[in-house]
């Protein structure tokens, strides 16, 4: 799980505004992390709030990575989006960028571009079964998953014991008591 936070442990303002809390160096390092993982996992809420594409952007990779690997070898990770309420639509930036997308949902809907696959998951306590999602990813040999999501999905993954590593980028800023926290835990 990758998180960016302020000194007071907040990931966003109370309004939800969260872009560019961390430094350009941290953002370059995130590109490196994306490039080395099989998949990037996020939520519909994060995709809608940030307009995220979750791709590896060559121009933003650290110089050391660019020097070691030719641009033509760049591989886009599978982007896995948890969308339990079928809120996402094909016109979002995520679906306009290169690379495969897997939508984890309770029900399949609509017509999607060829590179978008919908995966139905069972509900467990009214939420998508995240353990089933990770088991299905493992069956497809997707074993390294970078999570870039908000406090709800990150907290659920921690609660289910599905987190092996936390990467925290801390910015020299204060967002205040009303800001959003790192995790929603029961």
Q: Across the structure, where does each feature detected by a protein language model lie?
A:
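Conserved beta-strand edge residues that scaffold enzyme active sites
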Residues: 151-152, 172
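Active-site ligand-binding patch in enzyme domains
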Residues: 3-7, 11-144, 152-155
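A structural signal for short, well-ordered beta-strand segments
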Residues: 1-3, 166
């Amino acid at each position: 799980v990758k998180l960016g936070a302020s000194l007071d442990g907040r990931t966003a303002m109370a309004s939800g505004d969260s872009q560019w809390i961390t430094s350009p160096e941290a953002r370059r390092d995130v590109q490196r992390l994306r490039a080395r993982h099989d998949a990037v996992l996020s939520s519909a809420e994060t995709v809608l709030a940030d307009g995220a594409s979750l791709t590896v952007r060559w121009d933003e990779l650290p110089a050391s990575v660019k020097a070691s690997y030719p641009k033509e070898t760049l591989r886009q990770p599978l982007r896995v989006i948890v969308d339990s309420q079928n809120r996402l639509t094909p016109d979002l930036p995520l679906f306009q960028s290169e690379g495969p997308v897997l939508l984890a949902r309770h029900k399949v809907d609509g017509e999607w571009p060829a590179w978008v696959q919908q995966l139905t998951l069972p509900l467990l306590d009214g939420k998508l079964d995240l353990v089933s999602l990770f088991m299905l990813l493992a069956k497809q040999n997707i074993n390294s998953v970078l999570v870039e999501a908000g406090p709800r999905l990150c907290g659920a993954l921690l609660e289910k014991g599905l987190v092996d590593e936390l990467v925290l980028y801390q910015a020299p800023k204060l967002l205040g008591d009303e800001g959003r926290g790192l995790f929603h835990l029961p």
